[in-house]
Amino acid sequence: MKCCLKWFGIIFIFVTLIASIYVYNKTDGFSVKKIKVFYLQLTQNPWQEQYAYALGKGALPYLFPYFYSAQIRWKWTNVIPKDPASEPYAPINHFWHANRLVDHHYQGGGTPSNDTIYSTAWVHVDKEPVILSHPDMGERYFSFHFTKATSDILDVVSSQSTGKNAGHFALVPQGFNGELPKGVKALKTAQGSWYLLLARTMVKDKDDLKAVKLLQQQYLLTPLSYWGQPQENLPKSREMWQPFDAKEDPLAHWKTINKALAEDPPQNYEKSLMNLLADLHIGPNQNIDTLDKNSKLGLARAMEDGLKMMLMARASIPGGNVINGWRRNPTNAGSLGAAGDYFTRGVIQSFKGISPSIKTEGKYFGRSVDERGEPLHGSNSYQLTFKAGEEPPVNAFWSLTLYGMDTNLVGNNINRYSIGDRSQGLKYKDDGSLTIYIQHESPGSEKEANWLPAPNDNFSLTFRAYGPKPELFEGQWVVPQLSND
């Protein structure tokens, strides 16, 4: 068994080093001097430091979601934000609600949606079930994603999966043998004690915000022991452990990972990997302080260089396949861990997205270049045309959103940040086709209803399909190529 684990470790390290080389080559490039420095680091340091460095850096993409989730959980529950209207802040098992659609005034990046308004909550299910309740949503699209510490999705409550009628849904901890109240449906059994609950609620336009806010106020989280009691009786605790401070301890992030792993232990099929990492005292209930000095030095370097590697990878490896110039998010987004794709899970799904949308709820496509591979620029005139009968196959709606290269929305004279099938006054041609015009200058009054304003600068586009039909998320339907006249 130990022999197999050692070979597994060698292969794991080798694959990660190849990935590191790929990312490094895509960003900084190579030189003889850099190769010599790398070689000297390998040959002059004690073997314990080399081993800890290689294994620690190689394992970081797998372990990163645990660290990142713990950081975000603390921030969103215990750090008072500068702008409470756009930054989450709420007690445990309570919702925070955004109260406005994101526009160009928000400069936090991350390609924010201008179609839906967000609600978030950190759900703790260590002792008893917690019940999610929502009102009748009418014909409005909505979704609640229960996100694990790994950034994979445990379960979803949505207009697509559970229906638009009012409902109650219980997140149940492992080992619970009690009964749920009448009318409460059990979701998949929780695999850990903490979940990020992210809700997306469709907003037609600014005039629709009042109706959405009324719905949001009826999104409730109730621990089973408080079921039937007034909401004001619910505890508003923010008590949890704080991630270790890297300014005080070079091994702080590894200690945060160990504590997070103790709360949400890895799956049984990951035991071989955890047995390997146990050599470095990484894992549930492990103590890095008892590690030898050289291994500690290796882990400290591994965290520093590993985070740099992941930052470079996040910027240069968007993930997904490219068809007609559009790069789509991975088909198995939300379950990358179960698929064994830990690198993409750590770099893209967790580090870049926090809480992904599963394929049956939302499918995203992005691009920043034209059909010739040249960067998109507002001085050019682009058209996206859907032929008659070939509009996006969705059960909910679709949209096209424009972002600056800083991944923020871009201000414009008509305050239009996205365009789609909910946009008022879209004009179809006589043959039934629909063309969207993307450029800096107005395409003319007769085409302005179909105009998505662009800056006089480089930009990127994101196409979103909410409630996609199988032909879309399975790849039979693809977003048309962008033309440049």
Language-model region placement:
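A compositional/structural signature for long, glycine/proline-rich flexible linkers
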Residues: V23-D485
